Each structure stands twice: as C-alpha cells, then as structure tokens.
Amino acid sequence: TPDLLPADITGSYFYDPEKNKFKFRKGPIFCNILLADEINRAPPKTQAALLEAMQEKQITIEGTTHKLAAPFIVLATQNPIEYEGTYPLPEAQMDRFLIKLSVGYPDEDVETGILEGRSQRKKDTFSVKPRATPDKVVEMHDSIEEVFVKKEVMKYIVDLVQSTRRDPRVAVGSSPRGSLGLFKLSRALAVLSGR
C-alpha cells in the first residue's frame, strides 16, 4: 500500500522501558519466502528496502546487520504501471528478480476450469501442505552448484545477454546479473531434467 514504510517490512528498534534499552523487533522480511503482493504500490523508499535483502540476504538497520533466513526468496506481483497509485520499479530492483512472467488473462477453457475448481470447495479457504522444508530447499539449491556447464553453454548465455544490450528494441539491456541468473537457471533445469 502507498503508506507502507520500510520499517513495516524490515522491522525496527523500539525502546523497552523495563530493560532501559532498545530492542529489535523483526519485520515480515525475516522469512523464507516473502510475497510482495502488488510491489509497485509501495513507495520507492519502501521498495528500496528490499534491495540489500535480495542481493546480500541481509538487512542493515541503524548500522546493525541482520542475516536473513536461508533460503530467502522474494516473489512479487505487479500491477500494470498505468494503474493509478503505482510506482515504477527501479532498474536496480528489477535486476534482482531472476524471472518475470506476464500472466495475462486466462482463455475461456481455463477460466471455466477455475470456476469449476472453486465450485468444488465449500469455503474460500483451503489448506496448503508443505512440500519441502527450508533445509531441503537449501540442499536442492546447493546441488545445483555441482552441475557442470560446458563452455559452449556459457558462451551462449553471454551472447544472449550481450544481444539485449545491442538491440534498439530493448530499453535497458541485461546486467551481468542476467548472465548469472541464466547460468543458475540452466543448472537448475539440468537437475530437474535428471542430468
């Protein structure tokens, strides 16, 4: 929301009169998966609070660094920029998201399926069962690091990223984070494909 402050996400220090000192109260960023719903409704200063967390897996508040949980993943939804009350995401922040998907509207069959699925539930709530522990996700992430990538694949990744910097149809080409992201994605795909 437009009135969301950085401290609402990161947490803040508060004075404890009983102990006569300041204590840190963790914000919702201290989690494994942070869902930033409609991220571009948050003001730029609040969006900026995510930059260090997304890159360094830590946050610094009043000179004190706080490590975030492992794994730490940010998923975000975004409204079209032309919607009233939205702010553009800065390039530095967009650069930290590995993947961007444009969902769009479902076709007639898919939308009918959504309604059929909803009609089978009696309430608007449903339960979600965990599929993996945070430790298992870290283990899977670490297994990706063991995947060998041929030089030809690395060259293809670099060529692809470099082409985004030369193409006049691309407003802002990919940064080196794009190469690193494609490198990581190719390794993950190899693991998922059983290679």
Task: Annotate the PLM regions.
Residues 37-38, 49:
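Walker B catalytic acidic pair
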Residues 9, 50, 97, 157, ...:
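Residue-level signature of catalytic and energy-coupling elements of molecular machines
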Residues 16-21, 42, 54-146, 187-192:
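Canonical AAA+ ATPase core
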Residues 1-18:
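AAA+/P-loop NTPase substrate/partner-engagement loops
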Residues 15-35:
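Conserved alpha-helical scaffold flanking the Walker A/P-loop in AAA+ ATPase domains
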